Amino acid sequence: INSLLASAKKVINSKLSNKQKKVMFNEGTEKPYSSELLNEKRKGFYHCANCGNKLFASNSKFDSGTGWPSFSEALPGAFKTKTDYSFGMERVEYHCAKCGAHHGHVFNDGPRESGKRFCSNGLCLIFKPD
């Protein structure tokens, strides 16, 4: 993934805000409960804010109570993962498979169907309703 991330930094969308760039290309985290997408309930798809890659279907979104948009499953091939050892813990970070932008972390405490919780920074997503 390191080579993927290196190439992604060369194709940063010029329309991204400074906050988006910090989260997506410096592996930052937005404040909990700050995303406008947290309460989005319409049917549609969530895309990478940098490259437009389709990442999640709205029917996989659920309220995890964490303050970040959460999804039980990603679309096939949407992400690449890497282990994150920051803050004295081991977590799995996920990045857009197309451009390498950081989106969040995936945990094994999600709904029964998948057991996964993709905890996403809302700044990294664009919602497109059906």
Stretch-by-stretch model annotation:
Residues L5-D130:
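A short Gly-Trp-Pro
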